[in-house]
């Protein structure tokens, strides 16, 4: 109720040392037992962070901020480090005043496939905000936005930029207001891809994703560059001499990835040679 009233009345919280400008939010490593005002309410909260790991560093962790505790099990190559970044209110409400603090524990994963577990502390409570498949130290923070680089496995392994936003909302449950906080990815229209492969069959290309007019055909046995993709269904390809360029359709919703060739969905391994995937 306090937060809803604050938003409706456009009141500001007292500024704290943890508050940061949207342009220069700083990621900090948090030690077990650290204390501070992590939600801008004028009181001090203590952080307790403990991991339980086996000889392979697999296991779980427990995070307590103030009087709220969360736990996570079944992590792979779990780190003992905890990071946090202050999240200010949007300027529309109260510029630079502290909305809360995003805490991040993380695992390195089975094959350098990191996952950060994100928890948002605000108004005296700790909320599960979701995950980001990147290390906290590989992220940049701009208010409620987080920018990083993610791994993609469409027609090979490559990296793409990603932006996440911390969403928030309120709902009435009985006589009380419930708060919700969750990270969601902001999709891009297309991403730079930059992989080179070789065709096993002729590959027709079309002019655009919405115009199926022919843009030419890559011959069988020819090399081509996957230049861009929406990371869902469309890949923009170009012949090595740059004379033929256009789009083709893929479906990666299941294994194996399928490529549309002359109206027929065909396994990507039957269409392309030398697709490079990391383990």
Residue ranges and their predicted role:
Residues 14-26:
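Sec-dependent signal peptide cleavage junction
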Residues 31, 56-63, 114-116, 159-161:
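Repetitive beta-architecture junctions, highlighting loop-to-beta-strand starts
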Residues 23-25, 68-82, 130-132:
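Blade-edge motifs of beta-propeller repeat domains
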Residues 186-245, 257-279:
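Beta-loop motif signature
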Residues 29-33, 87-89:
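Signature of short aromatic-glycine-proline-rich micro-motifs recurring in repeat-based ectodomains
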Residues 1-7:
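Positively charged n-region of N-terminal signal peptides that target proteins for export
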Residues 36-47, 55, 93-104:
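Acidic, glycine-anchored loop motifs typical of Ca2+
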Residues 83-121, 125-196:
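Short aromatic loop motif centered on NTY/YTY
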């Amino acid at each position: 109720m306090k937060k809803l009233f604050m938003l409706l009345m456009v009141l500001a919280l007292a500024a704290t040392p943890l508050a940061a400008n949207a342009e220069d939010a700083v990621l900090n490593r948090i030690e077990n037992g650290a204390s501070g005002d992590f939600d801008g309410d004028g009181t001090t909260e203590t952080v307790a962070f403990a991991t339980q790991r086996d000889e392979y560093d697999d296991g779980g962790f427990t995070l307590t901020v103030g009087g709220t505790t969360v736990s996570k099990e079944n992590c792979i190559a779990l780190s003992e480090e905890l990071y946090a970044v202050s999240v200010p209110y949007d300027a529309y409400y109260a510029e630079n005043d502290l909305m809360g603090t995003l805490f991040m524990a993380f695992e390195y994963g089975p094959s350098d496939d990191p996952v950060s577990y994100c928890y948002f502390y605000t108004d005296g409570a700790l909320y599960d905000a979701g995950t980001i498949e990147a290390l906290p130290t590989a992220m940049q923070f701009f208010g409620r936005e987080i920018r990083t680089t993610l791994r993609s496995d469409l027609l090979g392994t490559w990296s793409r930029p990603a932006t996440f936003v911390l969403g928030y909302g309120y709902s009435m449950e009985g006589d009380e207001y419930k708060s919700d906080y969750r990270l969601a990815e902001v999709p891009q229209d297309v991403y730079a891809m930059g992989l080179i492969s070789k065709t096993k069959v002729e590959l027709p290309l079309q002019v655009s994703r919405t115009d199926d007019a022919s843009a030419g055909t890559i011959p069988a046995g020819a090399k081509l560059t996957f230049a861009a993709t929406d990371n869902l269904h469309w890949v923009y390809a170009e012949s090595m001499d740059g004379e033929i360029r256009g789009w083709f359709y893929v479906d990666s919703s299941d294994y194996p990835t399928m490529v549309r060739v002359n109206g027929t969905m065909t396994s990507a391994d039957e269409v392309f040679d030398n697709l490079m995937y990391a383990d």
